[in-house]
């Protein structure tokens, strides 16, 4: 998904950085693996706060951000043994730097919905949509039965300062008439080498969406998990600021201890991270769906017409 969503750009950017390491050899959710995920997330979200906005109003440097050479340079900055400090992370694209005051950010709204669907003819849809806050603006359209959103909060009303959920943005995401606000939505469809769809996924979760989708892709493609295993696996999240790792129950005590020794600050997530809805096409052509149990009301349905 292109700007003004930041999802597609930074999903590709992070995968480009990570492809330079043998992640599978490190072991899923090992300290070495999580360290590299976190350092990659840290740099991508620093770029997000500075460079992303509505491309109709601001020249978003998409080509530079997803360039493999740029990813390789970011990878070289990562010490495999020691955590970086977010305060020390500088913008990577010097030629398009924009001034922005750095402030603490907290995970944004989780009032977002995602669904994935796949029919017998091979048509695939991965759809994410949101009202922003719970019940959006709290105003419904008379006799129409739907709520109006409050997406204005996704703008940087004052660049360099946090919005209602603590996310910091820059000049690129400032308010202007007719402009679209920045989001983290990352509806994703993956194609195999034969250019056939093999995976549809996405999730709600505000600023955690991009990292959730990335971990779903790594779980399925890198670690050969089935779609149910990939969905159930514990997740982590880092978003540059605040400088700590959010993690779900299930992360091993050994991994947490090693990460702390490396200098990371761990913050037990007060809630589960996202609620992915995914469909995976097996090599034999069968479709396997997985609805995330992190949120109530999820479901996976398969229907066959006579």
Task: Place the predicted regions along the sequence by residue.
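Extended C-terminal subregions enriched in glycine
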Residues: 121, 179-180, 213-214, 222-271
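Active-site rim segments in enzyme catalytic domains, especially the processed small/beta chain
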Residues: 123-193, 223, 227
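Short, small/polar residue-rich loop motifs at catalytic or cofactor-binding pockets
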Residues: 109-112, 134, 183-185, 275
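Glycine-rich phosphate/pyrophosphate-binding beta-alpha loops
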Residues: 1-8, 116, 128-139, 202-210
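Alpha-helical support elements that line or immediately flank enzyme active sites
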Residues: 16-19, 203-225
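Short Gly/Pro-enriched turn/cap motifs at secondary-structure boundaries
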Residues: 5, 104-108, 173-182, 267-271
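Internal maturation/activation junctions in enzymes
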Residues: 20-131, 143-144, 151, 158-161, ...
């Amino acid at each position: 998904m292109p700007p003004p969503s930041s999802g597609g750009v930074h999903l590709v950017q992070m995968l480009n950085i990570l492809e330079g390491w043998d992640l599978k050899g490190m072991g899923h959710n090992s300290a070495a693996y999580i360290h590299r995920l976190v350092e990659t997330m840290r740099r991508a979200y620093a770029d997000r706060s500075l460079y992303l906005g509505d491309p109709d109003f601001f020249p978003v440097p998409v080509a530079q951000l997803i360039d493999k050479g740029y990813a390789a340079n970011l990878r070289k900055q990562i010490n495999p043994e020691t955590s970086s400090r977010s305060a020390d992370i500088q913008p990577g694209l010097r030629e398009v730097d924009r001034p922005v005051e750095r402030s603490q950010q907290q995970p944004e709204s989780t009032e977002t919905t995602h669904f994935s669907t796949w029919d017998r003819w091979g048509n695939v849809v991965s759809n994410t949509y949101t009202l922003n806050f719970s019940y959006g603006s709290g105003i419904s359209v008379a006799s129409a039965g739907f709520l109006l959103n409050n997406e204005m909060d996704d703008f940087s009303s004052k660049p360099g300062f946090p919005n209602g959920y603590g996310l910091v943005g820059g000049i690129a995401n400032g308010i202007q008439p007719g402009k679209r606000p920045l989001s983290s939505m990352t509806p994703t469809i993956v194609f195999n080498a034969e250019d056939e769809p093999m995976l549809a996924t996405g999730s709600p979760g505000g600023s955690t969406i991009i990292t959730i989708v990335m971990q779903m892709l790594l779980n399925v493609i890198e670690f050969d998990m089935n779609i149910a295993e990939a969905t159930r696996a514990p997740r982590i999240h880092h978003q540059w600021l605040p400088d700590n790792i959010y993690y779900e129950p299930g992360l091993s005590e050994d991994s947490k201890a090693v990460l702390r020794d490396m200098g990371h600050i761990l913050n037990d997530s007060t809630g589960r991270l996202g609620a992915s809805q995914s469909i995976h096409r097996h090599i034999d052509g069968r479709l396997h769906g997985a609805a995330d149990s992190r949120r109530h009301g999820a479901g996976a349905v398969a229907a066959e017409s006579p």
